[in-house]
Curated annotation (Swiss-Prot):
UniProt protein name: Protein-methionine-sulfoxide reductase heme-binding subunit MsrQ
The entry's keywords: Cell inner membrane, Cell membrane, Electron transport, Flavoprotein, FMN, Heme, Iron, Membrane, Metal-binding, Transmembrane, Transmembrane helix, Transport
Cofactor: FMN; heme b
Native source species: Pseudomonas aeruginosa (strain LESB58)
A Gene Ontology molecular function term of the record: metal ion binding
Transmembrane segments: 8-28, 42-62, 75-95, 110-130, 147-167, 169-189
Keyword Protease set for record: no
One of the GO BP terms on file: protein repair
One Pfam assignment: Ferric_reduct
Membrane topology type: Multi-pass membrane protein
Functional summary from the UniProt entry: Part of the MsrPQ system that repairs oxidized periplasmic proteins containing methionine sulfoxide residues (Met-O), using respiratory chain electrons. Thus protects these proteins from oxidative-stress damage caused by reactive species of oxygen and chlorine generated by the host defense mechanisms. MsrPQ is essential for the maintenance of envelope integrity under bleach stress, rescuing a wide series of structurally unrelated periplasmic proteins from methionine oxidation.
């Protein structure tokens, strides 16, 4: 397997972060409401992984190194895993597995609906992130996986709705996300490989 060391590093890193959070919860280091803290951190971790996934193609075009693409799918699947953990933690720590409370939560907090839409879209990408699905779907596979842009928008909207007045951190992620979208515009994406051939650009 090519770039096995890079894949291993991504695997260990993505696994270590939630494991560390669970350890912090175990030793009561997550504050007065560790359940909510875990929910928030898993959601933010999923957004970071989504941005990293979207950054792989521009990085490959800028550097010419194929290792970035080698871990793109892995990062995307870890993003889905974090979202799944985020949703599970919400059901356990916020809802207390009281499904009757879910209707009340949805009416009071519409951002949950936005988050669920993002999860459904991400689920579709996760189950089709394999060679069998690529062969079966053909040209439709690329069209389906453009849902990643919608997922980013939904994720940022979900976070904006949650943080409300505290916009400093949200703005940072929004700017990074918008920049990655700009780099994917055909007129800009075509120029990225040329940048590494210019003098002074390695």
């Amino acid at each position: 397997m090519r770039y096995w060391y890079l894949r291993l590093a991504v695997f260990l890193g993505a696994l270590a972060v939630p494991a560390w959070w669970l350890y912090q919860a175990w030793i009561f280091a997550l504050g007065p409401d560790p359940g909510k803290t875990l929910v928030d951190r898993l959601g933010l971790g999923a957004l970071v992984l989504l941005l990293l996934t979207l950054a792989m193609t521009p990085l490959q075009k800028l550097s010419g190194w194929p290792g970035w693409i080698a871990v793109r799918r892995q990062l995307g699947l870890w993003c889905f895993t974090y979202v799944l953990l985020h949703l599970s933690a919400y059901c356990v720590f916020i809802l207390g597995l009281d499904w009757g409370q879910l209707g009340i939560e949805l009416s009071k907090r519409p951002y949950i609906i936005v988050g669920m839409l993002g999860f459904i879209c991400l689920f579709l990408l996760a189950i089709t992130s394999n060679r069998f699905a690529m062969r079966k779907l053909g040209s439709r596979w690329k069209k389906l996986h453009r849902l990643v842009y919608l997922i980013l928008g939904l994720g940022l909207l979900h976070m904006l709705w949650v943080v409300r007045a505290d916009l400093e951190e949200w703005t940072l992620y929004a700017v990074v996300g918008a920049s990655l979208m700009l780099l994917r515009l055909p007129s800009i994406a075509r120029r990225l490989p040329r940048l590494r051939t210019r003098p002074g650009v390695s």
